[in-house]
Every structure is written in C-alpha cells, then in structure tokens.
Amino acid sequence: MPALHLFLPLCLTLALPAQESVRERELQTRIDKLEQRLAEIEAKLSLLAPITAPKAPENAPPAPSAVLKEAEPNPYRNTTFNATLDGYYAFNFNRPFDGNNQLRAFDQSHNSFSLNQAALVLERAPNLDAGRRFGGRLDLQFGQATQTLQGSRANENRPEIYRAIFQAYGTFIVPLGSGLQADFGKFASSLGYENNYTKDQMNYSRSYWFNYLPFYHFGFRNTYNFNSKLTAQYWLVNGSNQSEDFNGFKTQAFLLIAKPIKTVTWNATYYVGQEGRAPLADPGRFHVFDTYINWSPANGKWTAALEADYTINRNNTHEAPARVDGGAAYLQYQATPKFAFAGRFELLHDRAGIFSEKAQTLKEFTLTGTRTFADGFQAKLEYRRDFSNLPYFATGKRNQDTATLGLIWWFGGKTGAW
C-alpha cells in the first residue's frame, strides 16, 4: 500500500504538463483562425468601399464651413466725411458807412457777427496699394465765401447753379510710369500761396493775391510724380473762375513742384488763356507767372514763405497790356503746440486798376495770433493795416485798419491740409 501512495502522485504530476500543452495548442489554433478570418473581412471591405461610397453631385452646395468667408470690405472704409464752420467778427476803424471792408476776399463785414463759410467735404482718394485707381471729392460750401469764390455774371454764365459747389471732381490713376493722376471737374486753383480753408492758413484774412488770382477752374488737371523731388502738372480748363466757358477758348497751365531738400518746397506756374467774353474780333491773352517757395525746418517751429507774381492781360491783341505785379512774404513761429504767431507783408502794383478799379500801389501787413484749443477748434486774433499811395479807402483815407476775431471748427476723417 505504501508503494501505491507514492505512485499515484507521481502519475498525476506527469499528466498535468501534458494536458496544459494540449490546451495551449488548441488556443493558438483558434487565434490563428480568428486572425485569418479578420484579414478576409478587411480585404472584402476594402474592395466594397469604392463601390458603396456615395458620390457627391457636381453642383452640390459646399458644406456650411466652406461657405464661411471673410466679410466683404466696407465700401466707406477709405471715404472721409468732413465739415468745417468758420465765423468771425471784424471791426474797421474807418467805420465805413456801407459796412464793407474793402479789398477783402472773406472778412468783408464790419461790426457784424458773420459766417465766412460752412463747408462739407466728402472725399475718397485713390489707393493703389488696395488696387483702387479711382476716387473723387466734393466740397459743398455755404456763407459769405460763396459770393467771393463762385464769382458773378462777369465770369459765370449761370453762377447761381454752381454757388454751393466749391469743388467737385473725379480722379483716375492712369497706369503710366509711376502713375499719371488725371482729375476732371471743378477744383481749387493752386495759383498763389494761400488757399480756401482757414484752419490751414497762417492768417485769418486772405492776401491781395489770393483775392486777385483765380479761385477755381473747371476741366482737366493732370499730375505726374517723376520722383520724390519733382512733380509736374498740366491743366486744360475753361478759364479763370469759369464753370461754363463763355468764349470757347481753353486755358492752359504748366506747373512744376520741386522739393530739393526736405525742408523746402518750390512751386512755379505759367498760366495762359483768354478772359474776354465772345464775340471779340481779335481777342488777347491773359498771362500769369506765379511762383512761391516755402521753408519749414525739421523742428516745426518756424515757417517762412515768399511769393512773386506777374500778370499781363489784353482783351484785344492790339490794346495796351494791363499789368499787375508784386509779391508777399510770410513768417510764422509755433511757440507751443497750441500757440502760433504769424506775420504777412505784401505789395501789389495795380498798374491799370484791374484788381481795385483804380491804378495804384497797394500794401498791407497783418499780425495774427492763433490758439488751437484742440484738433478741431481754433481761434485767430488779427490786426491788419491796408494802405495805398492814393486816397482810396472809406472817408477818403489812404489806409484801412481792422481788428478781427475768427473762430474755426472742423471735424472728420481727413488729416492734414484740406
């Protein structure tokens, strides 16, 4: 019996490894079959995928995510809407009985609160960087200045229909060289150093030369920049202050704008046309030689300018020439960002009385203090003295003295000079 007890455990011990080996083989066989079956299924699916995948129709709308795109650019993004209000009070020490300050372009009223001009300016300039070659500008104007700037029936056939339009022109950049800018319409004249908007001027009142030379033209203005130092312009227009031509003759102007150094700008213009009304048997010519130079150092404290003008006019070829010549000098000191002081002196020889209706020599000097309260509000306090070599002004005097307070507001997206 003891021998039997030893034999049975030994047999069981030898049998267990044999049973485990059989089970492992069965499991491995089963795994191999499963892997083979899975491979067959994957092969069948790969063959069925091209057949069963739905085909999108050619004209099917894109997925919602594809519809989303960048918003369209704002068409008014580069358009500026601007406005200015320019009013004044002037006192003439001659106390003219008609309340009129003589030889003044804008500040014509004595001892009266007055509106020089209220203007709206809409502008969309060309932008080659944005791929836009066209643009335009519209200046609507109301107030006393319209009577000066628009002219009368002496030079306009129908002044009333253009009265409120100071400027209205379209622009196109011709793809020629650096870009030829062509403007068509009514635009402010660049003859003379001064321009229309008071906020951009050293003085409140305007010079004799601003008052005498053309205010505006209607026609073509072409500008070409040769480089950063030289620009040329050519005008083909109806004439001086003519929205509608009254003699059928087109006036031309040739301009050069040079910037030899950063602090100096020089303008030179030759302007020629016919200013006599048709019919004239042998019409003469009106010639203007105008030049001015501006100096402004980098520190921005000082600005100085000189202007010289010479004009000849003949209504008929064989009549004696009527000449007007002279010039002006300007100096401004920007004491602080808010305070500036400026002076102007000018001389005008009205040899045939074209400007003042009397052959005389006119001079004037002006002193102006400017206080800029903010970007958009400015006050100018000014003293001016006009004088002649002949008794010309009210009450038979040779001089006219005025004191003026001008208040100017402006706002809008346009930066720099208007």
Feature annotation, model-predicted:
Residues 16-104, 406, 411, 416-418:
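N-terminal periplasmic/intermembrane-space "pro-region" immediately following the signal or transit peptide
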Residues 5-15:
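Bacterial N-terminal signal peptides
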Residues 227-231, 254-359, 363, 409:
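Detector for outer-membrane/organellar transmembrane beta-barrel domains
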Residues 67-239, 246-253, 257-265, 330-333, ...:
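Outer membrane beta-barrel
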Residues 367-418:
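Predominantly the C-terminal beta-signal and adjacent terminal strand-loop region
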Residues 92-96, 145-150, 191-196, 243-246, ...:
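Outer-membrane beta-barrel proteins
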Residues 49, 55-58, 62-67, 301-304, ...:
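Gram-negative outer-membrane beta-barrel domains
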